[in-house]
Amino acid sequence: TLNALQALIVLKPEAAYKMAGDFARYLRFTLDSVTADGGIGSFREEIRAVRAYADINQQQLGDRLHMVYEIPDVDFPIPLLTIQPIVENAILHGIKPKVGGGTVSLKLEELPDHWQVTVTDDGVGFGLEAVREKGSIGLENVRRRMARFSGSELRITSTVGVGTQAVLTYGKQGKNMENLSKST
């Protein structure tokens, strides 16, 4: 990212200025997430970080990366660094290696007892053996964060050559609101 920023400063100063702002927002969110009490924050904060991260990659990938957001203007407590790493995986491991690039979509749905975030990419996909070989520290960290948050889970399905879908479910009740109020 810093190398790309350095190159943009000379070639496209306006784009470099925007990328520096996106990078600063992304770093601020990441650092704040590490120090957050209980690791609980707001959905809006997480989506701001996702957008900053996607915009940085948009500068690098250009037309090869398309982002689609179906996100209503709502906010609720979530464990931090759960959506952003999923989007990061979609871009790095799904879209970047695909000839011609692809699309990453984020959709939020409100259901009676939980919120559901679906991250879908039409990238290269992966098989179970790829996860076993490479390990998946990032996904394991997301699962661990979500396990501490009552009523939350992560489900991932992927097909080689077709893409990947991650469904993150966040419970609405009890412990979640208490954790958020403790962290503010």
Question: How does the language model describe each region?
Answer:
Residues 162, 167-184:
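C-terminal end segment of the histidine kinase catalytic
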